[in-house]
Amino acid sequence: MIRSDMTILDILCDHQETQEVFRRYDDVIGECVMCNHMFETLEEFCSRYGLDSTRLTAELQAAENN
C-alpha cells in the first residue's frame, strides 16, 4: 500500500505502474518529478508545491490497483 510517508523512489521501485501519475505532475510543477524529487516523501513533495497529498496518494493507489 502506498502511503504519504514513503519516498518517491520507494514508490517507483515497488510500484512501477505509478510512473504515469508522476509524469502527469511534471506539467503541474513545471519540472520532472522523477528527476528531481526521488528522495522526498510524498508529504514533503506535496508541501513544497502546495499539492493535496491525500489526492496524490489516492491517484497513486488507483494506479497500483489497476
Give, region by region, the residue ranges found by the protein language model:
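Compact, charge-rich alpha-helical regulatory domains located at protein termini
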Residues: M1-E64
